């Protein structure tokens, strides 16, 4: 029987030591252990008597035999509990052994106040426990229900709830900021790519069998502008030169075909042909090209100011070209042939008339524009006012 109620009984055989030491040591006081006496009587006033050893078992097993005198009230024996009280909780795992031989009632095993009080009637013992003061030792199962929920009460405290809400808000805000940054970066990269596609005129870069895949690429900066000069590979320049010799002006359809074949953009092909035409003009110093042995004039873009310039040219008065020497000789011969028709009555001599004829010819060719009109009267000799004639 390994109970703390039995171990003190064997103390007289082993020098006051228990047979099976445990974490706790419940013993009777020295006075009780030496004399093995039990005090009976109301309030402990009755005289004590020696209790034989063979009646000890009867004392503990109260239901079968023993002293059951209702006139006397059993004084509870004082038990000195030694050992750590926190380790007493481990005793719950050990198998319980009832003091009465059979498990009639678990409430009769009185652990709370570590006092052995046996009475003939179980009701009296229960009432006696209620009358006593609160026990000095409190075990986990004896504590009130509210003390075990200190952690729960702390969790549901207002301060803890506020801190938890603040932490949740901070976490949500950080996640939202991260997602927003990712979305903005993706949006910026998408707009940048769309801008590059628009600059390249939507032409797809395809690599053919004869094309050099390491062709020059467009180097663009952050603002989308091209940095540096565009370089072309040997194969690309050769094909472009062939196409230029065949036709210096490309249609849009042919330009797209060439750009796909050479892995270039439509804009690059267009600029290359423009530069090549300007270079050809500078080398040959001409304004026309020869294509397939034919004379091909360069195209002129119709502008709004062309019609206005043509109208102004029509309104301008064309300047008369200076007459050549052949025309002067022809006029002299013609005037000599009509010499008979001129009036000679007012002239004094033949020599004078010849001089007059010569002067009229000179005045007709070298006078001002208003005097060239034949209806005007030409004054031949101002000294001789009478010598006037009319040119027909």
Swiss-Prot record:
Sequence motif Antp-type hexapeptide, residues: 138-143
Pfam families in the record: Homeodomain (PF00046)
Annotated source species: Takifugu rubripes (Japanese pufferfish)
Keywords tagged on the record: Developmental protein, DNA-binding, Homeobox, Nucleus, Transcription, Transcription regulation
Protein role: Sequence-specific transcription factor which is part of a developmental regulatory system that provides cells with specific positional identities on the anterior-posterior axis.
UniProt biased composition (Basic residues): 297-321
DNA-binding region, residues: 225-284
Source organism phylogeny: Eukaryota, Metazoa, Chordata, Craniata, Vertebrata
Sequence similarity: Belongs to the Antp homeobox family.
Ranges for region Disordered: 290-321
Any one GO CC term of the record: nucleus
Gene encoding the protein: hoxc8a
Protein name listed in UniProt: Homeobox protein Hox-C8a
Subcellular location: Nucleus
Gene3D superfamilies: Homeodomain-like (1.10.10.60)
GO molecular function, one term: RNA polymerase II transcription regulatory region sequence-specific DNA binding
SUPFAM superfamilies in the cross-refs: Homeodomain-like
Key word Repeat present: no
Domain of life from the UniProt record: Eukaryota
């Amino acid at each position: 029987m390994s109970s703390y109620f039995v171990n003190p009984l064997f103390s007289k055989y082993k020098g006051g030591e228990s047979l099976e030491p445990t974490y706790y040591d419940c013993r009777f006081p020295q006075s009780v252990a030496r004399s093995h006496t039990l005090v009976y009587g109301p309030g402990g006033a009755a005289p004590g008597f020696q209790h034989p050893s063979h009646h000890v078992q009867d004392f503990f097993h109260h239901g079968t035999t023993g002293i059951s005198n209702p006139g006397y009230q059993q004084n509870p024996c004082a038990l000195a509990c030694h050992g750590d009280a926190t380790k007493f909780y481990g005793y719950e795992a050990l198998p319980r052994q009832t003091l009465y031989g059979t498990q009639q009632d678990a409430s009769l095993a009185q652990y709370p106040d570590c006092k052995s009080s046996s009475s003939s009637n179980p009701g009296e013992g229960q009432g006696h426990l209620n009358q006593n003061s609160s026990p000095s030792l409190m075990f986990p199962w004896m504590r009130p229900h509210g003390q075990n929920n200190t952690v729960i009460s702390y969790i549901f405290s207002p301060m803890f709830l506020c801190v938890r809400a603040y932490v949740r808000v901070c976490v949500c805000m950080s996640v939202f900021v991260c997602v927003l940054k990712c979305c903005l970066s993706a949006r910026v990269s998408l707009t940048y790519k769309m801008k590059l596609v628009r600059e390249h005129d939507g032409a797809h870069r395809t690599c053919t069998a004869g094309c050099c895949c390491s062709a020059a690429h467009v180097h663009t900066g952050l603002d989308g502008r091209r940095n540096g000069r565009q370089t072309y590979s040997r194969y690309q320049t050769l094909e472009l030169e062939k196409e230029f010799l065949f036709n210096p002006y490309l249609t849009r359809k042919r330009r797209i075909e060439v750009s796909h074949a050479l892995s270039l953009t439509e804009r690059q092909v267009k600029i290359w042909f423009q530069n090549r035409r300007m270079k050809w003009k500078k080398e040959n110093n001409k304004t026309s090209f020869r294509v397939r042995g034919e004379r091909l004039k360069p195209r002129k873009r119709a502008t709004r100011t062309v019609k206005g310039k043509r109208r102004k040219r029509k309104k301008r008065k064309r300047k008369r070209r200076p007459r050549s020497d052949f025309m002067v000789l022809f006029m002299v011969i013609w005037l000599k042939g009509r010499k008979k028709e001129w009036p000679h009555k007012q002239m004094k001599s033949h020599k004078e008339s010849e001089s007059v004829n010569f002067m009229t010819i000179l005045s007709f060719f070298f006078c001002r524009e208003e005097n060239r009109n034949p209806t005007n009267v030409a004054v031949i000799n101002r000294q001789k006012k009478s010598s006037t004639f009319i040119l027909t």
